[in-house]
Amino acid sequence: MLRRTVSNFAMSPYMLFISDLAKTGKLKGIRTPGKFVGKKYRQLSAKEKAALQQRAKQASTPAMTAYRRMAHREMSNKSVPIEQRRANLTKKWNETKQAQRAKAQKAQKKPKSAKSKVKKAAKKAKKSKK
């Protein structure tokens, strides 16, 4: 279970290649970026692919390091059976992901316009003049 989950977080050489192309701006204005990236990736030499694979092995994502830290902490409790430790780890990780998603969605919401606040302030000012 853990091996499969951690591998899902790992960065692949292809994903690194995509991020490199995106950073350089070569994907801007292309109608089918997936097709373009696939073609470019297949054209890479063996040396370039090996360099990408090396970088991918060294790359880590914040989610991967957070999961490893949590897994180490949860699995170190030897007084609890291994099945229960795994269940606890899965439960806590899912709760963490849900909290992060909620936080991200909250951050993406557009702020309310100041129009209503301006109207309220104008009404208060109008009432105070009377």
From Swiss-Prot:
Keywords attached to this entry: DNA-binding, Kinetoplast, Mitochondrion
Record has Transferase as a keyword: no
Disordered: annotated segments: 95-130
Residue stretches of biased makeup (Basic residues): 103-130
Chief subcellular location: mitochondrion
Signal peptide stretch: none
Prodomain residues: 1-10
General function of this protein: Histone H1-like DNA-binding protein involved in the organization and segregation of kinetoplast DNA (kDNA). The mitochondrial DNA of kinetoplastid protozoa consists of about 5,000 minicircles and 20 to 30 maxicircles. These circular DNAs are held together by catenation into a highly organized compact disk structure referred to as a kinetoplast DNA (kDNA) network. Binds preferentially to a specific fragment of minicircle DNA and is able to compact kDNA networks through DNA charge neutralization and condensation.
Protein name, UniProt field: kinetoplast-associated protein 2-2
Species in which this protein is naturally found: Crithidia fasciculata
Lineage, broadest ranks: Eukaryota, Discoba, Euglenozoa, Kinetoplastea, Metakinetoplastina
